[in-house]
Amino acid sequence: MQIGVFRKKESGKAYKLIADTGVTIKRQAGFSMTYQWKGCLIEHHKRVLDVHNPFLHTYLHSFFEENYCQELVLDGKVVNILSPLLTHLSVNTHILKHMLAFGIGIRQLCDTASVYRHYYGEVDGAELEKIYHKMGIYRWIQVLNALLVGYLGMPADFLPFPLSGNEDAEWMIEDVLQVGNFGFYDKRFGSKSMNTGTRRQNAIGSLFHHFKMNVCYAPAEACWFPLMQACSHVSNFLKFR
């Protein structure tokens, strides 16, 4: 289960609340944390958008504050969830992050397809296109959308904006079928028996391979991703050694 606590003050309170229960908390790259709660693995994320380009953070922060959430009533209680626009951005940037690391599986593609179907007609497609262009990942999103339509059979009408018709998704679907869920089945970088748990054999080889594949479609993210991951590793080491 993944939980997002996105404002700095709130994320600090959430960490203290969990730590006070006595559960073992593991820090992850990307300023996230994981722990086991009643037999369920929980991931806490501090960022609503997995965007690693630091020059976009001011723009994204102001955008986030303006478009943060909408209210949903569950069992008579009002809870806040991400707005439809932010849900699109959050899911797709999260998938891109994993694609830049060790790859993704069919499950992650279904996440995007589900969002498109659920929020069909509720998002301004032109505004979403503008944001993707600003983030420098528009071409990558077009490949992702082409894959959903061309290989998974999702009706093109559910897309938030039209396909460009210029992007070939064959390279992406081939990688999805090769690596499996989060890259644990990629025999190019270690056998299945080697890639178990949360550790992968020859992780550097996999990272470099996915960098080369994606850099033409999301250049800034592909370049900043390994740098920011390394920074978060160092930060966690210095804070919690």
Listing of model-derived features with the role each one plays in the protein:
Residues 5-241:
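Conserved NTP-donor binding/palm subdomain of two-metal-ion nucleotidyltransferases/polymerases, i.e.
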